[in-house]
Each structure stands twice: as structure tokens, then as C-alpha cells.
Amino acid sequence: VRSSAASDVYKEDIDYVKQFISLSPSTHILEIGCGEGGNLLPFAELGCKVTGIDRAASRIHQAETFFTASGYKGEFTTTDFFNFSSASRYQLILIHDVIEHISNKEEFFRCLSPLLAKRGIIFWGFPSWQMPFGGHQQICHNRFVSSLPFIHLCPGILYRFLLRCFHETPSCIEELSDIKRCRMTIDTFEQLAEKYGYEITDRQLWFINPHYQQKFHLRPRKLYPVLAQLKYIRNYFSTSCFYITRHRELHD
């Protein structure tokens, strides 16, 4: 059974989503990049029908094991999103800590709307690229370099050189370089949403990511409204960006 500490990790996510959609057993939810299924379990506990996809077979196995141990049903599939097809249409799509890893973001946005039910919504969560650890450098094996803020903003050649100096593995360097290539900013996200017919129903920028509460015992804090309105500057202070979007053609 999931611990109360693990439950708290996702509390802010589900509380945020519940402001914009009524959740019931008839609500069908898809998570893209579901990992071990932690985001989906709170929705399953509310009786929703949940589906998760992930490219990593090991993560899908973890999700299936996790749900079985918790006593809830979930449908999980190992697949790349760009190869995913479904006869179902989803009232809610979850995209948490995924979009910043996608290289072809335009195609990603374009492929989403056919999966949305009429009046369906999408929840997005991602770290702004320029925030202190927007490059995910915390995955480094070297404890010193993993705690260096803003190192990912160095020019690519210098960034890779520094990582090699700290004896990071080639696979780690390649992963971090790929994240640098695929980076996502607040402004880029909002431009893509507009281009592909999505209206932004709500935006919440976090100065302290809600997930830091369980990881680092830091209380979640929203970004000050004045800072949230300052283009470019806000990217450096937003450790997590929550959005709710709707597709205009599905809400006419």
C-alpha cells in the first residue's frame, strides 16, 4: 500500500486538476510518460479509469506491480507516444515532467488533440529551463557537480567539458546534453499552445516545486505574481510550471 509520504508528493497535482474537472468513475485519464504510476494512483483511488504509457518497459512493469500491490486497476502499455493509438478519448491527459524531454515538440502538440474527449483538458507540469536545476544535473554521479545550480546554462561545449572533468559517464553526459537540446521555457510553451489551438485555462508557476516537500522537506511556494508577469526573468525562478489547457475546437 502506498505510504502517506508518497501520497503527499502528488497531492498538489490532483488538488490543482480538481479545480477544472469533475472526477468520477466515468472519467478516463491518460498519462504520457507515466513512469511507475505514482501520478495515476490518486485518480484510480477516486474511481477513475486510468491508462499510462511509457517508453521504458521496466517502468511499465513497476507501474503494474505498484497498482497490483495497491489493489487498484490500471491499463499500462510500453510504447513511444508517437506510436500510440487509441480508440478511447480521454477527459484528462497528464503530461508531467515529459515535455522538456521531447525533441519534436511541434509534432507532440499536434498529436494530442485527437486523444482528447469533448471538453477534455490537459494538465502539464515541467521545470522552466533557466531555473537553477532546469538541466536535471542532479542526476550526475558526482555529488559536487550534481549540486551546482545553473551549470546547464553554459555553452554546450563547455558544459560537456565540465561534465567530463567531473568524470561523468558518457551515457550521463549524453542524457544531459539531450535535455539541453530539448529544453522548455515558459514562453516557448505558451507559443506552442497558441500555435496548435490550445487555450490556457490556468497557469501556476511555483517558486518551490510541490514535489520538493517530500524530497527536501521544503514547503511549496507559489511564485510571486509580480515575478510571474516578468517575461524571461520568471524562467529563472520557476522550479515548476503547472498549466491547464483546452483545445479550442473541442470546446466550441
Task: Label each residue range with its predicted role.
Residues 4, 88, 236:
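Structured loop/turn residues at beta-strand edges in well-structured enzyme cores
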Residues 7, 17, 233-235:
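S-adenosyl-L-methionine
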Residues 4, 41, 45, 183-187, ...:
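A structural signal for well-ordered alpha-helical segments within the folded catalytic domains
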